[in-house]
Swiss-Prot record:
Protein origin, superkingdom: Bacteria
Gene3D superfamilies: Winged helix-like DNA-binding domain superfamily/Winged helix DNA-binding domain
Annotated protein name in UniProt: Regulatory protein RecX
Cellular compartments per GO CC: cytoplasm
Annotated function: Modulates RecA activity.
Main localization (coarse): cytoplasm
Subcellular location: Cytoplasm
Single GO biological process annotation from the record: regulation of DNA repair
Keywords for the protein's UniProt record, in alphabetical order: Cytoplasm
Family the entry assigns: Belongs to the RecX family.
Source organism (scientific name): Fusobacterium nucleatum subsp. nucleatum (strain ATCC 25586 / DSM 15643 / BCRC 10681 / CIP 101130 / JCM 8532 / KCTC 2640 / LMG 13131 / VPI 4355)
Keyword set includes Membrane: no
Length: 189
């Protein structure tokens, strides 16, 4: 049995029973024939909310790239309806609009002064799969010593201990820092 959901439309706002407000576009009014409607069936309601979430997702993605989890959380926070947001995010992933692997690669390249430890922590927080993180950081591991050497030189005449602490905060491993320092000392001799 199909249930009808009571709605109120004021201007460009669709107000649900629970006082949740959905902002409507002119296209939504015509597509879903909303003029003078006081109720919606489940299927129409799902389609309407799906369409609204899709519009918001397009707008957000036009401004910048997002990780799947990041986009999903922002849409849920903005509009609600977690189950419908999940469907939209899956649809966008299938269409190639969301690609965690490419976004993670791009993020790692933009933050090249971070160590693998810090990058992996940030990427895990963003909801990137472990396989993707390990694959991306595998490429980064080879460059760690060189990055540390560059940072060490960049830090200049600062106190030895402070240089190490600064590099550790960027997510580099202590063992790698020691290797880089000894390598730099060997190069000086």
């Amino acid at each position: 049995m199909m249930q009808l959901m009571k709605i109120t439309i004021k201007g460009n706002k669709l107000i649900l029973d629970n006082d949740k407000i959905i902002y409507l576009t002119k296209e939504m009014f015509s597509k879903f024939d909303l003029k003078d409607k006081t109720s919606l069936d489940d299927e129409t309601f799902y389609s309407l909310i799906y369409f609204r979430i899709k519009l918001s997702a397009y707008t957000m993605l036009a401004k910048r790239d997002y990780f799947k989890k990041e986009l999903k959380n922002k849409l849920i926070e903005k509009i609600g309806f977690a189950d419908i947001v999940k469907d939209v995010v899956e649809d966008f992933e299938e269409k190639g609009y969301l690609d965690d692997y490419e976004k993670a690669k791009s993020y790692a390249a933009q933050h090249s002064n971070y160590g693998t430890k810090k990058l992996s922590f940030i990427l895990y927080q963003m909801g990137v799969d472990k396989e993707i993180v390990s694959e991306i950081l595998e490429d980064e591991k080879d460059n760690q010593i060189e990055k540390i050497k560059q940072l060490w030189i960049k830090l200049g005449n600062k106190e030895y201990k402070k240089k190490i602490e600064s590099i550790l905060r960027k997510g580099f491993l202590y063992g790698d820092i020691k290797k880089a320092i000894s390598s730099l000392e060997e190069e000086e001799e």
